[in-house]
Amino acid sequence: MSLINTQVQPFKAQAFHNGKFVEVTEASLKGKWSVLIFMPAAFTFNCPTEIEDAADHYAEFQKAGAEVYIVTTDTHFSHKVWHETSPAVGKAQFPLVGDPTHALTNAFGVHIPEAGLALRGTFVIDPSGTIKTMEVHDNAIARDVAETLRKLKAAQYVASHPSEVCPAKWKEGEKTLAPSIDLVGKI
């Protein structure tokens, strides 16, 4: 089932962020763009590489007015230790959200019940709390966060230019398309 153009459902979770335990709710996502990046579990193999990639691009997300949230089915306590012990995860300046009850992973359709883990899911959410992009895939395939950033910027662009669309491989500053009858069959 697609979650595109649906509202994020109410939730409450604990996260490790900037050396503290903090609460994250659906209200935390409102008023700014948000990127939720679901991962299977702390202390695994691909997950730290993705967190490091997100950390390397974090300034760009912030410049775009977006916050990044990493979500696993672990507790916020595990995230604290993971942040303190993994050189890659230690670079994270964004919230590491715990979902031990699987409420978030179920709400976003990425829970693997038989494993108690999450699939690799990425969701871009607009400031009103509406899901604008989603991508879910096998846990053996890590994501390229630069592509997530590109999708965020495309979602932001079409939100502020509703009569235009971003074509394949579109990057910020490049030409978009204005759908019209005159374009039909000409692309």
Feature roles, as predicted:
Residues 1-187:
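Chalcogenol-based redox active-site neighborhoods
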